[in-house]
UniProtKB/Swiss-Prot annotation:
Binding site for FAD: 180-215
Lineage, top ranks: Eukaryota, Fungi, Dikarya, Ascomycota, Pezizomycotina
PANTHER family for the chain: NADH-CYTOCHROME B5 REDUCTASE (PTHR19370), NADH-CYTOCHROME B5 REDUCTASE 2 (PTHR19370:SF171)
Entry annotated with the keyword Oxidoreductase: yes
Pfam families in the cross-refs: FAD_binding_6, NAD_binding_1
Name by which UniProt lists this protein: NADH-cytochrome b5 reductase 2
Any one GO molecular-function label of the UniProt entry: cytochrome-b5 reductase activity, acting on NAD(P)H
Entry keyword set: FAD, Flavoprotein, Membrane, Mitochondrion, Mitochondrion outer membrane, NAD, Oxidoreductase, Transmembrane, Transmembrane helix
Catalytic reaction list: 2 Fe(III)-[cytochrome b5] + NADH = 2 Fe(II)-[cytochrome b5] + NAD(+) + H(+)
Cofactor(s) needed by this chain: FAD
Domain of life: Eukaryota
Function statement: May mediate the reduction of outer membrane cytochrome b5.
Length: 323
């Protein structure tokens, strides 16, 4: 059984135990360390879920791709739109030179961004994960949260429309195929929601993919919850297959969700048991969260040993992927 914590925060976590409910009609086939959200994730951004179907002129597979990887080099894109989402978060839309082109990204993958500060000897390079649809022609969206002393996030927040930024990619993370796993669990902290949402959106867009998804999302404050509207839409549309649980370090008085940290007790309650077949747990967040939940990665190509809460609960290294 899986606990349900309402995205509308109307139901306390302790009262929320039940099985997946009947799914609503689809709208289209289309330890215990605190989660220090402000630390360590200066290189991540998140794109808004604003899928627009590709026009009839050419299917996505036949459209030109902006990012082709390999020895392509850096691609210069113009900032076309800025939307203030909160005092510390902006949505930035970067246009492609060819309005019919798609990004060329796949799930799950990211892009590198680069700029050179005035007077600096070396450029600043950071990875960002767009979550705008991979088949969206003409542009990509990032949602960027600014962090103190985070040179790339500070630069992006200082940009004006018509200024340009260099991108390179795609950088592969975890290749996804429909029904690759029966049930996946996404444990995210702060802007670590980025690749998680990219993956969830891909799953629920594909009518052939019947994967179940459980999200555990930790933040400092309620206003820090990125993509809350988009996550709520997924849960309302696919209640049999998508569940989201929220935990806040500093919740408001009226908060009815999880409080404090992502704990062993919470994960034991909401995650499938380690003995279940074909499950996968994904982790993405700041260093304190990795240390508590799964242990850190050694490098982009070395997942490192599985430690922390997930190891204590009996999950194996093969059942966990660290973004």
């Amino acid at each position: 059984m899986f606990a349900r914590q309402s995205l509308r925060f109307a139901q306390p976590l302790k009262q929320g135990f039940r099985k997946y409910s009947t799914e609503a009609p689809s709208k289209g086939k289309s330890s215990l360390a605190p989660i220090y959200v402000a630390v360590g994730l200066t290189g991540l951004g998140v794109g808004l879920y604003r899928y627009n179907s590709a026009s009839a002129e050419a299917p996505p597979a036949e459209r030109p791709k902006v990012f082709t990887g390999g020895d392509q080099g850096w691609v210069d894109l113009k900032l076309a739109q800025i939307e203030n989402l909160s005092p510390n978060t902006k949505r930035l839309r970067f246009e492609f030179p060819d309005k019919e082109a798609v990004s060329g990204l796949h799930v799950a993958s990211a892009l590198l961004t680069k700029f050179k500060p005035h007077g600096a000897e070396k450029p600043v390079i950071r990875p960002y994960t767009p979550v705008s649809d991979e088949e969206q022609p003409g542009y990509l969206d990032l949602v960027v949260k600014v962090y103190p002393n985070g040179p790339m996030s500070e630069h992006l927040h200082s940009m004006n429309v018509d200024q340009r930024l260099e991108f390179k990619g795609p950088i592969p993370k975890y290749p996804w195929e429909a029904n690759k796993h029966k049930h996946i669990c996404l444990i995210a902290g702060g802007t670590g929601i980025t690749p998680m949402y990219q993956l969830a959106r891909k799953i629920f867009k594909d009518p052939e993919d019947q994967t179940k998804v459980t999200l555990v999302f930790g933040n400092v404050r309620e206003e820090d919850i990125l993509l809350k509207k988009e996550l709520q839409e997924l849960e309302n549309t696919y209640p049999r297959r998508f569940r989201a649980f929220y935990v806040l370090d500093h919740p408001p008085k009226e908060w009815t969700g999880g409080k404090g940290y992502i704990t062993k007790e919470l994960l034991k309650t909401v995650l499938p048991e380690p003995k279940e077949e074909n499950i996968k747990i994904f982790v993405c967040g700041p260093p304190g969260m990795y240390k508590s939940i799964s242990g850190p990665k050694v490098s982009p190509k070395d997942q490192g040993e599985l430690t922390g809460i997930l190891a204590e609960l009996g999950y194996s290294k093969d059942q966990v992927f660290k973004f």
